[in-house]
C-alpha cells in the first residue's frame, strides 16, 4: 500500500467542489493509499531528519462532512512513499523553509511533488523568462522610469507584482492613465521591489486558459477563465467564470514546448496560464482547476498524476 502525505491549507475550510488537493486525495483513496494529512506547522527537522505530525484521513464527497481523521502520529517523512506539497502561496520565507524540510525528506527517500528545489527555483511569474519566444513582451525591474518607458513604447500594458496570486494587484495601464506613477510606486514599493510589465494581450476577453501538465504530458482539456464584464482579469478569485474546453493547436504547442523542462526539473504537476497565444505564468506551487475540467470531460487528471507517482515510487 502506498503511503501518501499531503501538505495543504486547513482541510476544514476548503471548497470540495473546486479544491484540486481534495480531488487528488479522493483518487489516492480510491486506489487504497493511506493518506497522511499535514499543514505547514506539522513539518519539523530533528538532527537533520525530516519529521512530521500527521493525521491519517478518510474523505467523502459530502459538503456537510468531507473528512475524518483516523489516527495521529509523529513519523519520519521518509516513511511516506510520496508527499504532495499543496500549500497555497504566499511564497514567503516560511514556505521556503518548508521546502528545505521537504528536501531533507527527499534525500531520505520520499518522492516530493513538486521537487522542493524547483519550487524555490521557479517563481511562477519569472520562470516564463526562460521561454521568451512564448510570452508577451515583458520586462522585470524596480525602476519607475523603465516601466514608464515600456508603457510609452507599448501603450496598453499590464503591471503586476512577482508574488501575487488569484489576480491580486494586477493593473492594466493604458495611454494617458493619470494613475500610472502611483501604480508603479505601489507595485515597486517606491523602487524597493521588482515588478513585471507586459504588453496587454487583447485576447483576454476569450479567457485566461489554465492548462495542466502532468509529468511532462499536457492534458487535452483546459479551463478558460472568462473575465467578468469590465474586468481585465480572468482569475476565478477575481470574479471570472470558468469554462472547460479542449486545447487549441496553439495551446498544445505552447504546452509541449514547456513540458520537457518541467519534467526535467521534477515539476510533476504544473498549471500553465495562456492568454491568446501567449504564455503568461507557470504555476508550480498548488495549481488548481482539476475539478472543473474533470466535471466537464471524461478525463481523470488525478488518475494521471497518481500513475506518475506510482511509476516513480516503483522506480519505473
Curated annotation (Swiss-Prot):
Known InterPro entries for this protein?
ATP-grasp, ATP_grasp_subdomain_1, Glut_synth_pro, GSHS_ATP-bd, GSHS_N, PreATP-grasp_dom_sf
Superkingdom, natural source: Bacteria
PROSITE patterns given in the database record: ATP_GRASP
* Keyword Nucleotide-binding applies: yes
User: How many cofactors are bound and how?
Assistant: Binds 1 Mg(2+) or Mn(2+) ion per subunit.
Q: Which key words tag this protein in UniProt?
A: ATP-binding, Glutathione biosynthesis, Ligase, Magnesium, Manganese, Metal-binding, Nucleotide-binding
Name the coenzymes or cofactors required.
Mg(2+); Mn(2+)
From the UniProt record, which GO molecular function terms apply? ATP binding; glutathione synthase activity; metal ion binding
Catalysis performed (reactions): gamma-L-glutamyl-L-cysteine + glycine + ATP = glutathione + ADP + phosphate + H(+)
Q: For binding Mg(2+), which residues are annotated in this chain's numbering?
A: 281, 283
Q: Which pathway?
A: Sulfur metabolism; glutathione biosynthesis; glutathione from L-cysteine and L-glutamate: step 2/2
| Residues annotated as binding ATP | 150-207
- EC number, UniProt record: 6.3.2.3
Question: Which residue range or ranges hold the ATP-grasp domain?
Answer: 124-310
Q: Which GO terms describe its cellular component?
A: cytoplasm
Positions of transmembrane segments = none
The record's section on HAMAP family has: GSH_S
Family assignment from sequence similarity: Belongs to the prokaryotic GSH synthase family.
Q: What is this protein called?
A: Glutathione synthetase
Q: What taxonomic ancestry is recorded?
A: Bacteria, Pseudomonadati, Pseudomonadota, Gammaproteobacteria, Vibrionales
